[in-house]
Amino acid sequence: MINVEGEQIEIIDAHSHMGARKKLAIHQIPPIMKFMAEDMLQSMDDAGVDGVVTFAIGIGEPSDYRETNQYIANSMKQYAGRIHGFMRLSPGNGPKDTLQVLEEGVKLGLKGIKIHPLIEHCPANDKERVYPLMEAAQHHGLPVLFHCGLGEDASPKRIGEVAKDFPKLPIIMGHSGLVEGVREVVEIAKKCENVHMDSSGVGWLPFFCESIAWAGPDRVLYGSDTPFNPMEWEIEKIVKHAQRHLKLKIEDLRLIMSGNIKRLLKIS
């Protein structure tokens, strides 16, 4: 919980990572090779974060993510109410194997799906490799968070096509498309009621404020991308700077900081 104008605001981070990396990705400096449940809980306590949605860290080499999915499911049980696990899937492995991993994740009790089209070398709207996963996700009522931005395979346009083709499937555009994609993501969200966006990675405040003003506070989720960004950065961006510029109501802050992700995950 954090205090805003005398009001207690619950905080649930909708975008975080756990696990261990085997090979270093060149763009991550300083290198983050391992971030486990204990590290997550410490970061949460330091930032006043009540809960997190978390999924496997990019492993740095081809993987089906089974091992980390299992670890996250175990952590979710150990820290019930604080850790909400998503399974990570690699569509590039083909639909047969990946659907099996998905069904295993459902049995583990994981609450959603994360896909990074760039790391997995698979366009977000791939009809043969991704759409069977979306059909299964929709069947099981699992929200899907796509990394959005930095490359054509993960473009807002491609993910928007998925959202249009699966209108009952909750889609989260991770990082809101980053700075270059924010406005396109907002336009998609205005047309597709199943599209949401998280705050992580939108470093230019005017664009982030536009996402709230144009798409509405019921479509924006607080997310940090921890451990790659400190949780406190995103909290301050929203509750201090965006609130000042937009004069957000406390009710709007509650939606962004926890209410929207609780609704998507059916957390009471």
Task: Show which residues each predicted segment covers.
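Mid-to-C-terminal alpha-helical segments outside catalytic/metal-binding sites
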Residues: 1-14, 18, 23-51, 217, ...
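Active-site environment of divalent metal-dependent phosphoester hydrolases
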Residues: 19-21, 59-62, 92-94, 118-121, ...
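H/E-rich (His + Asp/Glu) clusters that bind or coordinate divalent metals
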Residues: 170, 177-268
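Alpha-helical scaffold segments that flank or form the walls of functional sites
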Residues: 30-55, 62, 69-77, 103-107
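Conserved, mostly hydrophobic/aromatic
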Residues: 15, 44, 72, 76, ...
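A general structural detector for well-ordered alpha-helical segments in enzyme core domains, enriched
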Residues: 39-43, 68-75, 101-105, 129-133, ...
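Active-site gating/metal-coordination segments in enzymes
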Residues: 59, 63-143, 191, 195
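Hydrophobic faces of well-ordered beta-strands that scaffold small-molecule active sites
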Residues: 11-16, 52-54, 84-88, 113-115, ...
